[in-house]
Design a protein with these regions (language model features):
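Glycine-centered hinge/linker elements that transmit conformational signals in sensory
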Residues: 18-32
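His/Glu-based metal-binding/catalytic segments typifying zinc-dependent metallopeptidases
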Residues: 31-90
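A generic structural motif
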Residues: 29-43, 107, 153-160
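M16 family metallopeptidases and their MPP-like homologs
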Residues: 1-7, 58-75, 96-201, 219-228
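PAPS/PAP-binding and catalytic site of the sulfotransferase fold
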Residues: 4, 15-22, 139-140
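Short helix/loop capping segments that flank catalytic or ligand/cofactor-binding pockets
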Residues: 14-15, 27, 72-75
Length: 230
């Protein structure tokens, strides 16, 4: 079973016969398909692994992955976006600008519904092997600080303004509507309804609790690739 989406400036009467000819003529077996849980779950608890590899340019690459359960809701999706953007700004200030130890710390978030509701937060950066432990400590400390105190008013307002502007700009983008149609039919959630109201309502306390709830679940993976000791 397939769902086809058409987004953009399409003349319906012109498109109908083409859809009937090229899609309507496809064979069907009347089978309802669904996802398959391959049981490849992210490991629980705290896990750290550091290994060395010869490199032409000696570099340490550090990856943190935090995982846990969280309901698949529009508000949680928005909170995750707030959290990653705040962390991006904090790490730019505390790691890149103050320490000068990396070009940047990248934060990625993913809220999943299938095969089970799950929240992922990944933090990645590269640095001089001699600075890896110090910078990794700062990264963890700033994440814990966000979970304990929430973001500053300045960071909160910057993210809020950006998200509202991006939302307004997205109304004109076909790709945005394509993704939202997919979310609606696949996940059963309208990612546009009430979006601006939720963004405007987000507080520092909301973000603090969201990050704290993730860290309290105690699932942290830290993997470091560095160079052999000479």
């Amino acid at each position: 079973d397939f769902t086809f989406y058409f987004v953009g400036n399409i003349d319906l009467e012109t498109a109908k016969p083409l859809i009937a000819e090229y899609l309507g003529a496809l064979p069907a077996i009347n089978r309802k398909e669904t996802f398959k849980d391959t049981k490849m779950s992210i490991r629980k608890g705290v896990y750290k692994n550091e290994y060395a590899k010869e490199q032409q340019t000696p570099t340490a690459t550090i990856v943190f992955l935090y995982s846990g359960r969280a309901p698949y809701t529009l508000k949680n999706d928005i909170l995750l976006s707030f959290a990653t953007q705040v962390l991006d700004m904090v790490y730019t200030e505390e790691v890149r600008e103050k320490e000068g130890g990396t070009y940047g710390v990248n934060c990625f978030g993913d809220l999943q519904k299938y095969p089970k509701e799950q929240l992922l937060l990944q933090i990645v950066f590269q640095t001089d092997p001699a600075k890896k432990d110090k910078l990794a400590g700062i990264v963890v400390d700033e994440l814990k600080k966000l979970a304990a105190e929430g973001p500053s008013d300045v960071h909160l307002q910057k993210v809020k303004e950006y998200m509202l502007k991006k939302y307004a700009d997205n109304q004109k983008e076909n790709g945005y509507w394509m993704n939202n149609l997919n979310d609606y039919f696949y996940y059963g959630m309208d990612m546009t309804e009430g979006y601006t109201d939720i963004v405007n309502s987000i507080t520092a306390k909301d973000i603090q609790k969201f990050v704290s709830d993730l860290l309290k679940q105690g699932n942290e993976i830290e993997v470091t690739m560095t160079v052999p000791n000479k």
